[in-house]
């Protein structure tokens, strides 16, 4: 095969059309974190705001840990197995993580997590608990997001990845803005 024929192959266009949005999606967090930090630094107690955000997100990401492998699982099995079985399995996994999230956040288990594991107290503990209560659904959404991104990759529908990445970015900024302007920390 000649060098010129190598790049006329449609594979390279499809690969780039998937690689670019997925790469941006993976690195959007590095871009979004300083923006969110800039909101938190403007609060009346920046150290508290950043600490509350960090602890809350750590707990939520721990609960949603399966989301890190859902994308791979979907990519590997989506074309060779029943799509309904895969959708059901992922939905079941998302529901299980949601139930765990509800149990940890809305039961006395939150006392063990916040007091014993993270050692929070006073105003920080109250704010972390409030942050967890308004974001308890994040593990559910993360699992579904990774599943749908994987379907987009397998079906070569990069426009869905762009839509998901851009809308996630916009909603994150919008949500942070609303919380900031409503003075949520009080």
Give the label of every model feature segment.
Residues 11-18, 37-61, 123-127, 186:
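Interfacial/gating helices of multi-pass transporter permease domains
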Residues 18-26, 60-61, 135, 161:
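Residue-level signature of transmembrane alpha-helical cores of multipass secondary-active transporters
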């Amino acid at each position: 095969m000649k060098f010129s024929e190598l790049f006329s192959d449609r594979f390279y266009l499809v690969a780039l059309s998937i690689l670019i949005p997925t790469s941006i999606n993976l690195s959007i967090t590095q871009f979004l974190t300083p923006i969110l930090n800039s909101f938190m630094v403007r609060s009346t107690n920046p150290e508290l705001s950043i600490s509350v955000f960090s602890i809350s997100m750590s707990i939520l990401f721990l609960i949603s840990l399966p989301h890190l492998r859902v994308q791979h699982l979907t990519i590997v099995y989506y074309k060779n197995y029943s799509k309904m079985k895969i959708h059901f399995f992922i939905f079941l996994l998302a529901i299980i993580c949601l139930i765990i999230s509800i149990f940890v956040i809305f039961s006395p288990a939150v006392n063990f997590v916040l007091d014993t594991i993270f050692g929070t107290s006073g105003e920080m503990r109250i704010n972390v608990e409030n942050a967890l209560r308004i974001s308890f659904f994040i593990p559910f959404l993360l699992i579904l997001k990774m599943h749908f991104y994987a379907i987009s990759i397998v079906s070569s529908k990069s426009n869905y990845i762009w839509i998901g990445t851009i809308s996630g970015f916009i909603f994150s900024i919008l949500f942070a803005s609303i919380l900031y302007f409503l003075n949520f920390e009080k």
